[in-house]
């Protein structure tokens, strides 16, 4: 038996406390913690205010699990098309040893400021094998 586990350390946000993904889900949706204004025509770095670690879990013998850190990716959800935003670096590659804050660079391609609402989900974390 082997599987992928994602540890999320929220820094003040409670959005992830009861979040459970189902078998077959492509990734884990990320919630914006606050209202964020992205100025028109600008690129900015947005902080999700979480730290994460993804591990590949193997059962090495009955009942004994071994966790090996693995890299993961930050990608846009398909619903981002409804906004003027796009991920500035297309795909964010997060190394297996990175333990800093999870952030995303976004471009606002509109002629108007765009407001990201708290709890809005425009990005997700996925395993590279997807």
PLM regions and their residue ranges:
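DUTPase catalytic domain/fold
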Residues: 1-130
């Amino acid at each position: 038996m082997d599987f992928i586990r994602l540890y999320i350390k929220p820094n003040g946000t409670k959005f992830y406390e009861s979040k459970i993904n189902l078998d077959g889900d492509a990734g884990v949706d990320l919630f914006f913690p606050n209202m964020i204004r992205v100025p028109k025509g600008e690129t900015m770095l947005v902080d999700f205010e979480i730290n994460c670690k993804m591990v590949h879990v193997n059962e090495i013998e009955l009942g004994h699990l071994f966790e090996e850190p693995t890299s993961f990716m930050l990608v846009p959800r398909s619903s981002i098309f409804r906004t003027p935003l796009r991920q500035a670096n297309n795909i964010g590659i997060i190394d297996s040893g990175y333990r800093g804050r999870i952030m995303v660079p976004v471009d606002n391609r509109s002629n108007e400021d765009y407001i990201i609402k708290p709890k809005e989900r425009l990005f997700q974390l996925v395993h590279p094998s997807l």
